[in-house]
Amino acid sequence: MSSKEQKTPEGQAPEEIIMDQHEEIEAVEPEASAEQVDPRDEKIANLEAQLAEAQTRERDGILRVKAEMENLRRRTELDIEKAHKFALEKFINELLPVIDSLDRALEVADKANPDMSAMVEGIELTLKSMLDVVRKFGVEVIAETNVPLDPNVHQAIAMVESDDVAPGNVLGIMQKGYTLNGRTIRAAMVTVAKAKA
């Protein structure tokens, strides 16, 4: 038998087997190449995704730090502004008893006595000068009557029946109150009107 005539156990010539195997390989190869992804491409895609995520985190971090710095700057400016505005608070609190003493001296002074008129005038001028000076620095006196009771600036000491003043309004001032740049440094002690029973 010649080599062409040799048959394989299945009854096929060796050339036919080679051809069949070659066709099977060709048929399998396109499927394998479609399924087979280059691991480098996958790694590149993964690294690009990680890079994009890192850049986003970095951008967010920078924005957050900028926002925190801006907030810190604003808070610092407000703190400095408050420190300037209210730096005199302790000093003004020390002056209030002096102003109260001058007020009481005027209340008890015998203004009808001609011998005391010079002293009364001196006390009035001293009190006026002192109040003018503290007003320049933002201090205001709380001494109005017949205004609604405001717990932010008034401290009610007593309630008194009154026909002249509406109920709930300030009837009288026992001790003047003071504000410094709108902040109450001492509430006015007041009597409050109530309706007659």
Curated annotation (Swiss-Prot):
It comes from the Bacteria. It is found in: Cytoplasm. Keywords: Chaperone, Cytoplasm, Stress response. Residues 1-39 are annotated as: Disordered. GO terms for molecular function: adenyl-nucleotide exchange factor activity; protein homodimerization activity; protein-folding chaperone binding; unfolded protein binding. GO terms for cellular component: cytosol. InterPro entries: GrpE, GrpE_coiled_coil, GrpE_head. GO terms for biological process: protein folding. It holds the Pfam family GrpE. Its main location: cytoplasm. Belongs to the GrpE family. PANTHER family: GRPE PROTEIN, GRPE PROTEIN HOMOLOG, MITOCHONDRIAL. Participates actively in the response to hyperosmotic and heat shock by preventing the aggregation of stress-denatured proteins, in association with DnaK and GrpE. It is the nucleotide exchange factor for DnaK and may function as a thermosensor. Unfolded proteins bind initially to DnaJ; upon interaction with the DnaJ-bound protein, DnaK hydrolyzes its bound ATP, resulting in the formation of a stable complex. GrpE releases ADP from DnaK; ATP binding to DnaK triggers the release of the substrate protein, thus completing the reaction cycle. Homodimer. This is Protein GrpE.
